[in-house]
């Protein structure tokens, strides 16, 4: 039995050989990799994002834990965790895990505890960045630096490893998220597809930005 792929061409052209097909796919991959390099963050842009994240996290650690750690009690989410951030830089998304004592303190509030919590986190950041535009609504506190917006999701760690995050809409509530399950799923899909899923996600985002 022939080892050639069963790609049938019009009469007279015969089967498409592996030797013909492979160079075409090599070219596609090379163009894909070059496009990905062209839209990936530059080293300067990447370091700027890292610095902004570290500064915001250090500020919140001082307020809630009495330390100045630039990374403790936080983790990246979104395109920065997925390694799909592209230029031009837009935002850095992160979870900041608050002490459980903060949750119990806000439980004494009668109205929209979640909104009050976001405003407290915003005020803690405003003390360090008084001239920077900020907002706190929905699930995030947004710190709008000139080059990046850092979007902070205040969260509480549950015994299950999941998190509660704020939702200020409709009177306020907590939403349960399972980021680690999502992370494991993305890792599995990426590995099963030759580590191409994350670059494809970045490519898709680049095409989307070019249209809007």
Which ranges hold each PLM region?
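Catalytic cores of NTP-dependent nucleotidyl/adenyl transfer enzymes across multiple folds
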Residues: 44, 54-57, 122, 130-131, ...
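Histidine-centered divalent-metal-coordination microenvironment in nucleic-acid enzymes
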Residues: 81-97, 140-155
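A gly/proline- and charged-residue-enriched helix-loop-helix capping module
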Residues: 113-129
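Short secondary-structure junctions
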Residues: 67, 71, 127-136
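N-terminal regions immediately upstream of nucleotidyltransferase
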Residues: 1-89, 100-112
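Generic hydrophobic/packing signal
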Residues: 96-102, 125, 129
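Acidic/His-rich structured neighborhood in mature extracellular/periplasmic domains
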Residues: 95, 111-114
């Amino acid at each position: 039995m022939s080892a050639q792929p069963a790609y049938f061409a019009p009469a007279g052209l015969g089967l498409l050989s592996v030797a013909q097909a492979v160079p075409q796919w090599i070219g596609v991959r090379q163009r894909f990799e070059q496009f990905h390099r062209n839209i990936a963050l530059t080293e300067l842009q990447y370091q700027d994002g890292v610095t902004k994240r570290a500064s915001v996290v250090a500020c919140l650690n001082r307020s809630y834990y009495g330390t100045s750690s630039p990374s403790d009690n936080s983790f990246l989410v979104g395109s920065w965790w997925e390694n799909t951030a592209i230029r031009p830089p837009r935002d850095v998304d992160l979870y900041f895990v608050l002490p459980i004592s903060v949750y119990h303190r806000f439980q004494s509030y009668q109205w929209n505890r979640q909104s009050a919590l976001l405003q407290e986190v915003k005020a803690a950041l405003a003390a360090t960045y008084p001239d920077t535009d900020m907002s706190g609504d929905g699930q995030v506190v947004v710190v709008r630096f000139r080059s990046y917006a850092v979007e902070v999701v205040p969260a509480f760690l549950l015994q299950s490893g999941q998190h509660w995050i704020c939702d200020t809409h409709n009177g306020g509530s907590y939403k349960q998220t399972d980021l680690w399950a999502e992370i494991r799923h993305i890792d599995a899909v990426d590995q099963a597809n030759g580590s191409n899923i994350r670059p494809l996600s970045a490519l898709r985002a680049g095409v989307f930005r070019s249209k809007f």
